[in-house]
């Protein structure tokens, strides 16, 4: 199993990147969002990877964080969602947008992804709504970048310093902490996830304490 790729980018396209690792070129499929955040050709990068094995095909899929990789695994557990459709969903919504859509039951948000129709979007929400809080709770624990980058050989012209792929925003940690706090208060995972997602949608940059207060207001009994 290949869990991480670190090397020099030889070519970057919208949906894949060719990475040279000690003379061997690996084609790694990525979302458009990830591709846009990668450094240009000639610079070093590192990605977490998932290897898809079929009878006649081996494909590598790359992710800037372990959290995004975990969301990809969860998406592909749904019937009708292949690895590339899962990438399209992540590329369209990002990990934060996906977690919010699942927690709120907003299947229309998933329809924005290429290749996702209304029936598939509804199936994804129905099957993953109760599973999403577990991944959301992992939060910042899985948003670390893929680690040190290899040195880039200087050949004739100077090559800029290696630039890692951009990691997921720190809001993932605030979300995880808020979910943990609400769980300690006795709220069900799906109930807490829905409230935290709605609170985060209203104020994306909210720190943990503010997120908890906002979620508690949403969970308070309505008069």
From Swiss-Prot:
Signal peptide: none annotated. It holds the Pfam family HHH_5. InterPro entries: DNA_helicase_Holl-junc_RuvA_I (IPR013849), Hlx-hairpin-Hlx_DNA-bd_motif (IPR003583), NA-bd_OB-fold (IPR012340), RuvA (IPR000085), RuvA_2-like (IPR010994), RuvA_C (IPR011114), RuvA_C_sf (IPR036267). GO terms for biological process: DNA recombination; DNA repair. Residues 1-64 are annotated as: Domain I. Coiled coil: none annotated. Its main location: cytoplasm. The RuvA-RuvB-RuvC complex processes Holliday junction (HJ) DNA during genetic recombination and DNA repair, while the RuvA-RuvB complex plays an important role in the rescue of blocked DNA replication forks via replication fork reversal (RFR). RuvA specifically binds to HJ cruciform DNA, conferring on it an open structure. The RuvB hexamer acts as an ATP-dependent pump, pulling dsDNA into and through the RuvAB complex. HJ branch migration allows RuvC to scan DNA until it finds its consensus sequence, where it cleaves and resolves the cruciform DNA. Belongs to the RuvA family. Residues 144-169 are annotated as: Flexible linker. Residues 65-143 are annotated as: Domain II. Homotetramer. Forms an RuvA(8)-RuvB(12)-Holliday junction (HJ) complex. HJ DNA is sandwiched between 2 RuvA tetramers; dsDNA enters through RuvA and exits via RuvB. An RuvB hexamer assembles on each DNA strand where it exits the tetramer. Each RuvB hexamer is contacted by two RuvA subunits (via domain III) on 2 adjacent RuvB subunits; this complex drives branch migration. In the full resolvosome a probable DNA-RuvA(4)-RuvB(12)-RuvC(2) complex forms which resolves the HJ. GO terms for molecular function: ATP binding; four-way junction DNA binding; four-way junction helicase activity. This is Holliday junction branch migration complex subunit RuvA.
